[in-house]
Amino acid sequence: LQPMAIALAAVADGTSMITENVFEARLAFVEEMIRLGADARTDGHHAVVRGIPQLSSAPVWSSDIRAGAGLVLAGLVADGETEVHDVFHIDRGYRLFVENLLSLGAEIERVGS
């Protein structure tokens, strides 16, 4: 769940350190968060994230299930419209993801198949 924690930390007060001990490549997600304006960096098995008041919209690419979900969550709090590409990853792990977010009041639209 590191990508979701990183998305939350990106707009939380203070500095957070999120550790990934199993799949270090999962932290590649941090680069996509930086596209959204996050103040974040990786240091080995750790992501260090300093919270900022607002993320910015940008096109981002999902590399796996969790990264996709984290990018969608970050996009929901970003200023403007964020396009998350390669969402087929999300489909593999989260049933009715968009529909569930819509039911919670999210402004989200799935474009294409």
From Swiss-Prot:
A biological-process GO annotation: regulation of cell shape
SS bond partners: none
Binding site for UDP-N-acetyl-alpha-D-glucosamine: V22
Cell wall biogenesis/degradation keyword on record: yes
Gene: murA
Alphabetical keyword list: Cell cycle, Cell division, Cell shape, Cell wall biogenesis/degradation, Cytoplasm, Peptidoglycan synthesis, Transferase
GO cellular component: cytoplasm
Annotated GO MF terms: UDP-N-acetylglucosamine 1-carboxyvinyltransferase activity
Pathway stated in the Swiss-Prot or TrEMBL entry: Cell wall biogenesis; peptidoglycan biosynthesis
Name the record gives this protein: UDP-N-acetylglucosamine 1-carboxyvinyltransferase
EC number of this enzyme: 2.5.1.7
Domain of life: Bacteria
Classification lineage: Bacteria, Bacillati, Actinomycetota, Actinomycetes, Mycobacteriales
Matching InterPro entries: Enolpyruvate_Tfrase_dom, Enolpyruvate_Tfrase_sf, MurA_subfamily, RNA3'P_cycl/enolpyr_Trfase_a/b
PANTHER family documented for this protein: UDP-N-ACETYLGLUCOSAMINE 1-CARBOXYVINYLTRANSFERASE (PTHR43783:SF1)
